[in-house]
């Protein structure tokens, strides 16, 4: 018997208003044939590779933490092109256009030789080797050992006009049901945050807030035991509607498991035994040992983990000291540096050598020491890093049209304020009162709401600021990266009315005649 039934599927209606389409910068930014070369000084930093060193009172930082496993986030400040005194004023019309920078090429220079760094902990939480054990070793109240290892090898850089977005796992707030027991595992959640200069990268133990989630302070090495390791959230940045945080990136990671250990301590999640499923033994993971065996009363821990190794460090697989050219960015922002700034996030632990410095503590002449005594020498650790940044910038124009300004205003209204295009309301009264001695007791109190100053949106974040406002040059052929750019693009540099421009090099070779017999 056929019975009619109403359709159970949902009916999806289109939105009542059209969805705004985000345009690519190539659709409204006009590029010129004027290129600049920008370069930084040699950027150096020195510190302790594992932790900050304070004075005896702990009130003053004496030696900062400088590790090869840290993120280096450079904030490059570029000059405002709208304030340039261009020799050729026909390049743009300041009444109808605004100038912006576009990043066309970058080279991240790294100094210092290749080297492998070692990290570790003098009280590392490991019971023993679980790969090739020769006897059954049960855990005790304290099985910590002095262990060191080399971290995962990592080379990476991310270029954008906004800070790089990172991700890590952190402690989450539990549900308020009142059934939380003391010592139970807390819930965890994925957190997005800006990667700042000095934030630790993943060295093989994951992107985790170790300070909050490893309270024994013994499960990882000293350099991350009190830190939060972050990893760039490539999925979020690739799906960003504007693509300001990541124009493009390059990365190379490698590691392998070198040693296999087991943790000490009480197991939080016991191995399911035979009592589940009403004793049917369907989910039993092991057969109980004999009562005469040591493991009968003291079963070993099942918290297995490896120590990773970055393996070989070679100059054949280097991402640095070579140019990268930006033709098409992964997002809608094709290399336009809004607010005249560029963020370069770098991680490179292939130059991870830590210097060991030994000093005679009693001050005697080393040549007069007859018997070696290790207690008379004080050992220090230092790590150094060396960077140099070079850029190729292209001068671009943005027409001040209504549809373009609406697009930019929806993206970030502060850009229009930076261009001094903000909405200025008509004055209510043409005559205003101005007191001469406004701060004196004889006059009324000054305005409680003074005009707001320009606020840096990243003032609470820590970056390595690099000022390039006076480091630009039109003479591309005078610099290494500039010559590479001219050669790879098939361009030649010319001077027109005092302005350096580049044009295509066209070859005019004659036709080869056929040889007569």
UniProtKB/Swiss-Prot annotation:
Subunit architecture: Self-assembles into homopentamers. The capsid has an icosahedral symmetry and consists of 72 capsomers, with each capsomer being a pentamer of L1. Interacts with the minor capsid protein L2; this interaction is necessary for viral genome encapsidation. Interacts with protein E2; this interaction enhances E2-dependent replication and transcription activation.
InterPro entries in alphabetical order: Capsid_L1_Papillomavir (IPR002210), Capsid_L1_sf_Papillomavir (IPR036973), dsDNA_vir_gr_I_capsid (IPR011222)
Family as reported in the entry's similarity comment: Belongs to the papillomaviridae L1 protein family.
GO term, biological process aspect, one: endocytosis involved in viral entry into host cell
Pfam families cross-referenced by the UniProt entry: Late_protein_L1 (PF00500)
Subcellular location: Virion; Host nucleus
GO molecular function: structural molecule activity
Main location: virion
Signal sequence segment: none
Keywords from the named record: Capsid protein, Disulfide bond, Host nucleus, Host-virus interaction, Late protein, T=7 icosahedral capsid protein, Viral attachment to host cell, Viral penetration into host cytoplasm, Virion, Virus endocytosis by host, Virus entry into host cell
Cited function: Forms an icosahedral capsid with a T=7 symmetry and a 50 nm diameter. The capsid is composed of 72 pentamers linked to each other by disulfide bonds and associated with L2 proteins. Binds to heparan sulfate proteoglycans on cell surface of basal layer keratinocytes to provide initial virion attachment. This binding mediates a conformational change in the virus capsid that facilitates efficient infection. The virion enters the host cell via endocytosis. During virus trafficking, L1 protein dissociates from the viral DNA and the genomic DNA is released to the host nucleus.
Name by which UniProt lists this protein: Major capsid protein L1
GO CC terms: host cell nucleus; T=7 icosahedral viral capsid
């Amino acid at each position: 018997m056929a019975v009619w039934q109403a359709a159970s599927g949902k009916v999806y209606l289109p939105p009542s208003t059209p969805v705004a389409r985000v345009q690519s910068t190539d659709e409204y930014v006009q590029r010129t044939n004027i290129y600049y070369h920008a370069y930084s000084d040699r950027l150096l930093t020195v510190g302790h590779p594992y932790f900050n060193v304070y004075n005896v009172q702990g009130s003053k930082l004496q030696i900062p933490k400088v590790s090869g496993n840290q993120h280096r986030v450079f904030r490059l400040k570029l000059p405002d092109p709208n304030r340039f005194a261009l020799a050729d004023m026909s390049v743009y019309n300041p009444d109808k256009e605004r100038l912006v920078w576009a990043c066309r090429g970058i080279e991240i220079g790294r100094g210092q030789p290749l080297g492998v760094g070692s990290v570790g902990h003098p009280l590392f939480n490991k019971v023993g080797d679980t790969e090739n054990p020769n006897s059954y070793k049960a855990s005790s109240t304290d099985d910590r050992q002095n262990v060191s290892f080399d971290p995962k090898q990592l080379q990476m850089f991310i270029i954008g006009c906004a800070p790089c977005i990172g991700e890590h796992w952190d402690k989450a707030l539990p549900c308020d049901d009142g059934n939380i027991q003391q010592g139970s595992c807390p819930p965890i959640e994925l957190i997005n945050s800006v990667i700042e200069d000095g934030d630790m990268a993943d060295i093989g133990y994951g992107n985790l807030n170790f300070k909050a989630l490893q309270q024994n302070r013994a499960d990882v090495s000293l350099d991350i035991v009190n830190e939060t390791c972050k990893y760039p959230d490539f999925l979020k940045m690739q799906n960003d509607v504007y693509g300001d945080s990541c124009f493009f990136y390059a990365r190379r990671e490698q590691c392998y498991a070198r040693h296999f250990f087991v943790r000490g301590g009480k197991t939080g999640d016991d191995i399911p035994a035979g009592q589940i499923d009403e004793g049917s033994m369907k989910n039993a993971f092991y057969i109980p040992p004999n009562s005469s065996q040591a493991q009968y009363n003291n079963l070993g821990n099942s918290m297995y983990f490896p120590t990773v190794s970055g393996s070989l460090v070679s100059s054949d697989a280097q991402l640095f000291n070579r140019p990268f050219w930006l033709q098409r960015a992964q997002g809608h922002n094709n290399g336009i540096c809004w607010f005249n700034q560029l963020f370069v996030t770098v991680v490179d632990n292939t130059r991870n050598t830590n210097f060991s410095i030994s000093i005679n503590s009693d001050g005697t002449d080393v040549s007069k020491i007859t018997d070696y005594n290790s207690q008379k020498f004080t050992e220090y650790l230092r790590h150094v890093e060396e960077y140099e940044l070079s850029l190729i910038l292209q001068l671009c124009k943005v027409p001040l049209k209504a549809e373009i300004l609406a697009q930019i205003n929806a993206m970030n209204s502060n850009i229009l304020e930076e261009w001094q295009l903000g909405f200025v309301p008509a004055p209510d009264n043409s005559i205003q009162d101005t007191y001469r001695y406004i701060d004196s007791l004889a006059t009324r109190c000054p305005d409680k709401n003074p005009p707001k100053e320009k606020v840096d949106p990243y003032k609470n974040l820590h970056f390595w600021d690099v000022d390039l406002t006076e480091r630009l040059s039109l003479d591309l052929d005078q610099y290494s990266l500039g010559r590479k750019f001219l050669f790879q693009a098939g361009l030649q540099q010319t001077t027109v009315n005092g302005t350096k421009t580049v044009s295509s090099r066209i070859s005019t070779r004659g036709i080869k005649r056929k040889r007569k017999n």
